[in-house]
Amino acid sequence: MANVIVIGAQWGDEGKGKITDLLSRSADMVVRSQGGVNAGHTIVVQGQTFKLHLIPSGILYPDTECIIGSGTVIDPKVLLQELAQLQGFGVSTENLFISQTAHVTMPYHRLLDKASEERRGKRKIGTTGRGIGPTYADKSERIGIRVVDLMNPDDLREKLEWTINYKNVILDKLYNLEPLDPQSVISEYLEYAEQLRPYVVDSSLKIYDAIKKRKNILFEGAQGTLLDLDHGTYPYVTSSNPIAGGACVGSGIGPTVIDRVIGVAKAYTTRVGEGPFPTELHGEIGELLGDRGAEFGTTTGRARRCGWFDGVIGRYAVRINGLDCLAITKLDVLDELKEIKVCVAYELDGKICHDFPSNASEFARCQPIYETLPGWQTSTSDCRTLDDLPKPALNYLKFLAELMEAPIAIVSLGASRDQTIIVEDPIHGPKRALLHANGEPVSITND
C-alpha cells in the first residue's frame, strides 16, 4: 500500500498528466484535490489524445476509482462535456466520484473574473477567465454554492436567488454589465444537478475507506508550486494551494497517511500569464523550446513563455513540498541544442541569492546566474534506460538532481506512455532523508 502525491515543481504545465497516467497503473484510486477548469492535462494513449480539466488522469484505467475532491471548484457544464468526450471514445466513467462539498463555478463567477481582469489594466494577473478566483473568493466569503446544494432543489433556489441578486448589483453598478436572470440560472443548474447526481459522494469518507483497506492512492495536483496562493509568486498565483500540503486539505485526509511526494519538472522552464520569470528566453532558443515542446496552454491555448531550467525555484519546490523524488519531463525538447544553461543562483541588487525571494518586486529584479552544460544534439525519444542516453544528457540529469537535492525517479522523453525511463520505483521507493545532511551529494537515485 502507498499513498502518493504528485505535484508540479514549477509554474504548472510540467507534464503531471502523463506522470499521473503512468502511475495510475499501480493505483486503486486517483484523487484531484484542488483547482478547476483553469488547469488542464493532456494524455496520449495509443495515438489518441485526451485533454481533461477536471476529471483525474486515472479515468483511462477501467479499474481505477477517480475522485474530484472537496478542494476543487467544479464547472458542471465543462465536467459534463468531459464525461461525454470520454464516453464517446468508449471510456467508462462509472468509477468517477464527485465530492459533495466541492464548490461550484457559476455564470456570475466567469463574468466577474473577466471584468475584474480587464479592469486591472497593467496590473492584470493573467487569469484564464474561467471564474476560478471568484469561486474561491465566494468560498472564503461563505456565500458559495456547493455540489450538495445542487442536490437539493429547494436549497439551491433559495441560495441562488439571494446570491444572484447580490452579484447583479456588482455586475451592474461596478462593471456596467447586464444582470443575470436568477430563474434562468437556477433552471440550468438544476438540469446539471440531475445529470451529475449519480456521481456525488462523501469523498473524504470514500478516500478514508480506501486507506483502511490499504489501497494504493494517488493524489493528483493541478498547476504548480510557484502558483500556490501562499507560497507562489504572489500576486501572480492561482486561488488554491497546489503544493503537497494542499492535497491533504483538498482531499479531506490527514498528512500522516501520505507515504511519498513526487515533484514533476520540465527539463527547462515555462510559464503562462503574467509575473516575473528570471530565466525567460525571448530569442531563437525560446522559440525553439516553444515549438519543439508544443508549448500552448491546454486550457487557454495561450503560448507559454519558455526559459532555461531554474534550479533556485527547483530547490524551493523540493523544500516546500518535502519532495521524495523527481520526474523530469520533456528532456527530448533539448535534443537539438549545442549547449544548455541552468540557473544555479540569482544576482539580486549586487548580491548572490541562492533562495527564492518571497517579495514579488525583489523576484522581478533577480538576474539568473548560469552554468553552461554541453548539449547532446542527438535524439533521445527512443531511449528506454539511462544507459541508452547520450552521456551529456545523463550528465545533465545528474546535474539537476544534485542542484535540486532530490533524486530523479522518472525521465520522460515524449508524450506517449512508452517514451519513459523508470529510474527507480517512484511509488514504493525509499523515503527521502534530508539530502546533504550526511555530507554526501545526491545523484540521480538515492543509491
Curated annotation (Swiss-Prot):
Species of provenance:
Rippkaea orientalis (strain PCC 8801 / RF-1) (Cyanothece sp. (strain PCC 8801))
| CDD domains documented for this protein | AdSS
PANTHER family in the record, alphabetically? ADENYLOSUCCINATE SYNTHETASE (PTHR11846:SF0)
Can you name this protein? Adenylosuccinate synthetase
State the compartments where it is located.
Cytoplasm
List the active-site residues.
Answer: D13 (proton acceptor), H41 (proton donor)
What does the record list as GO biological process? 'de novo' AMP biosynthetic process; IMP metabolic process
- SMART domains under this entry? Adenylsucc_synt
The protein's gene is named purA
Which EC class does it fall in? ligase
Pathway per its UniProt entry is: Purine metabolism; AMP biosynthesis via de novo pathway; AMP from IMP: step 1/2
